[in-house]
From Swiss-Prot:
Pfam families: YbaB_DNA_bd. Binds to DNA and alters its conformation. May be involved in regulation of gene expression, nucleoid organization and DNA protection. One of its GO terms (molecular function) is DNA binding. This is Nucleoid-associated protein LBUL_1514. It comes from the Bacteria. It comes from Lactobacillus delbrueckii subsp. bulgaricus (strain ATCC BAA-365 / Lb-18). Homodimer. Keywords: Cytoplasm, DNA-binding. It is found in: Cytoplasm, Nucleoid. One of its GO terms (cellular component) is bacterial nucleoid. Belongs to the YbaB/EbfC family. InterPro entries: YbaB-like_sf, YbaB/EbfC.
Length: 109
């Protein structure tokens, strides 16, 4: 009997080797993701008038608002500052995730 041919373009790997490699890759990605979830990410708006701090799993950990940011005559301004700080914090998480996990997903899409 002839030896089963390896998958073309896979560097001569057989199915068992590919599965082993995929499992290793999955474990590395899980470790990277866990590392991100333990980090904190901060979004700031208008010279730190509003500061939103998140954990890497996108949980809002704290929201700091300077008293001078609270103007009873202009609640829309405070809303805008909170939205800006929150969006900046979430964007930092997205960027860190892309940077960390992007090396594994590059070429898959």
């Amino acid at each position: 009997m002839s030896k089963r041919p390896a998958f073309p373009g896979m560097g001569g790997m057989n199915m068992q080797q590919m599965m082993k490699q995929a499992k290793k890759l999955q474990e590395q990605m899980a470790k990277e993701q866990e590392n991100i979830t333990t980090q904190e990410f901060t979004g700031k708006a208008a010279d730190d008038m509003v500061v939103a701090t998140f954990t890497g799993d996108r949980t809002l950990k704290s929201l700091f608002i300077k008293p001078e940011a609270i103007d009873p005559d202009d609640p829309d301004m405070l809303e805008d500052l909170v939205i800006d700080a929150v969006n900046k914090g979430l964007k930092q998480i997205d960027q860190a995730t892309q940077q960390s996990l992007g090396k594994y997903t590059k070429g898959l899409m």
